[in-house]
Amino acid sequence: AIIFDLGLSSFQLLDYTRGFSFKSKSKIDMNMGLASISAEYVLNNYSENNLKLILKLLGEESEAHKIVKNIIKARDVKKISTVSQLVEIIEKSKKKDYKKKINVCTKTFQALRIFVNKETSELINGITAATKFVKSGGKIIVISFHSIEDKIVKYYFTNYSKNKSNPSRYQPEEKKNEFIFFENYNKKIIKPSTDEIINNPPSRSAKLRFAIRNKNEFK
């Protein structure tokens, strides 16, 4: 089996120099080590439309328009370089909902981190490689922590599964099975128990999915 734990490392979060934490006073970098750009560069150089797309698609931020408008205004006056600057912009743009536990900055920070580190493409590349190397009967297990990751995993497992694929009825039988790499996929999500969440609060958003490899060769 191959297991993917897509959670952000606590060591990275606690390293305030990387700019992942809202509490950081450092530069807003968000680079995990391999990225060619920083969040600082994105915030100060990307167009208004591109910034809105990043926040909407990768952060699922419903108030992306307001936040980006204020980012543009702020950077026209002074370069956005620190986490505290971005936090201030977001807090001015969004009303705090005391009924929700999530910080108002969470979705924007998530979107920038995913974009800077190309996390979605890295996930796709990873599970594709795993499909190639896992033998028949082996499992590919993925623990995701937000809906974007989960949607990618669900789509991948479903699309290449025996019971979910819908090939054309006009294709020959061997072609119908050519791109089926998993046995009947059970789309049930495994979530952490109440005890796990109490002992490990960051696990509250975790979702585990797995698929069982069949004997078809991955070419």
Regions found by a protein language model. Give the residues of each.
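S-adenosyl-L-methionine-dependent methyltransferase catalytic core, i.e., the SAM/SAH-binding region
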Residues: 1-219
